[in-house]
Amino acid sequence: MFLNNKVDYLLNLSQFKDLDLANVFQDEPLHYVDIGARGGVHDLVTPFASNVSVLGFEPDEKECSRLINMKEVVDQWANFALEPIGLYNSKGIRKLYLHSVDTNHSLLPANSKFVNRYSMEKFKVIGDTPVEVDLLDNIYDAKFMNSGPFAEFVKIDTQGTEYEILQGAKKVLQKDSVALVIEVSFFELYEGQKLFCDIEQLLRKNDFAFFGFSSKLHTRSCKFLDKQNEITRERVMQADAVFFRDPVTSEKTSTKRQNQSIFIISLTNNFIFKNFVSSIIRYGHLKNIG
C-alpha cells in the first residue's frame, strides 16, 4: 500500500475500504496533538484527515487567529482547535526568543557558537516577547479529562524545548498515546537544549521505543568546500524521530483502541512501518483490530 500526503488518500484507497477498521474512527476520530503548530498542521495525518481530531498548540496568538480563520486549514479535519499557549515543564510566563525567521522562534535563544560556525543567519536572535506556558498534563486535567481519548498521536516541534514538554506530559503519555514524532537535535542548536539521546532515554523510561526517522536528516557544514568538486559528508543537525508504544515489548497491555491507532498511524504518510504492523499481528497483539 503506497501512501502520499493528499487529504484522505488513505480513506479513499480501495484496499483500505475493504478493512473492518475503515469505519472505526468515523464515530470517534483519531486524536492528534500538534505542538508547535505555526504554519498549520503537519501533514503526517492528512491521508486520514476527515477521521482525525486535531488539537494544536502555538504560543503566538496572532498565528493562532490566522490559522483558525483559514478554511483550507480547518475544514479538512473532523475537528480542529488551537490553544494559544506554549507548553513546558512548568507553569508561568517565559521569554519567547524571536529569531530572524519566525519558524525558528523558541523559548531558548539560538546558540551563537553554532550560529557563527555554520553562518546560520536565520537563527540570529532579534528580540523577545513574554508568552504564557503550562504543562500539557495541566491542560488535559483542566479541559479534556472527560472528553474521551486524548493525544493518541503527538507531534512536537518547538525548536529546542521538546524534552521539557515531554516532562510536562507524563500523565498524558501514559493514558492514550501510542505514537510520537519529535524533532530532535544532535548538537546544541539552542542554548541548553536537550539532544536526541536525552529524549530517547526519557521516552524509553516511559515505555516508548525509537523506530527511526520520518524524514531526511538535516545537516550543516561550514561551506568551506565546493560540493561539486569534493565528496564529503556533513554534520547531522536535526531530524524527526518516530517513537511507538510497542505492544510486543511494552509492560502495559494495549487496549483495542490503541491497537487500532497503531495500525492506522503506522501506515500514514511517510511512516509506512509495514514490518512493525506485520510483526505485532504475528505476535497476536492486533488479532482484533476491526
Regions flagged by a language model, labelled:
Residues 1-290:
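Phosphate/nucleotide-binding beta-alpha loop and adjacent structural elements of enzyme active sites
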